[in-house]
From Swiss-Prot:
The modification O-(pantetheine 4'-phosphoryl)serine is found at residue 40. Activated by the transfer of a 4'-phosphopantetheine group from CoA to Ser-40. The lineage of its organism: Bacteria, Bacillati, Bacillota, Bacilli, Bacillales. PROSITE patterns: CARRIER. InterPro entries: ACP-like_sf, PP-bd_ACP. Belongs to the acyl carrier protein (ACP) family. It comes from the Bacteria. Keywords: Phosphopantetheine, Phosphoprotein. The keyword Phosphoprotein applies. This is Acyl carrier protein AsbD. The gene is asbD.
Length: 91
């Protein structure tokens, strides 16, 4: 997925799923906490939505807080993720 498409996907998650009224656009230098007012609980929600909506696998052991400092660092992190594989649960 191209970077611009990832940015648009994150914007859609923030505005539609997380219902952040203060977010109208994203710039790579925007800080998630200070500029977009995303707290730690919302960061966890964002990770879940990245997996569900963007279909990227976010391994718990690879989540680095530095990846969630700015929009740009989040996009860098997302570019490194693998596509989420459909898990077939047939017991």
């Amino acid at each position: 997925m191209r970077r611009e498409a990832l940015k648009n996907a994150v914007l859609k998650i923030m505005t539609e799923k997380m219902e952040l009224k203060n977010v109208t656009h994203l710039e790579e230098t925007m800080r998630l906490n200070q500029d977009l007012y995303i707290d730690s609980v919302m960061m966890l929600q964002l990770i879940v939505y990245i997996e569900m909506d963007v279909k990227l696998c976010v391994p718990e052991d690879e989540v680095d807080p530095k990846a969630f400092l700015t929009v740009g660092s989040l996009l860098d992190f997302m570019e490194e993720l693998q596509p989420l594989q459909d898990v077939n649960v047939n017991n």
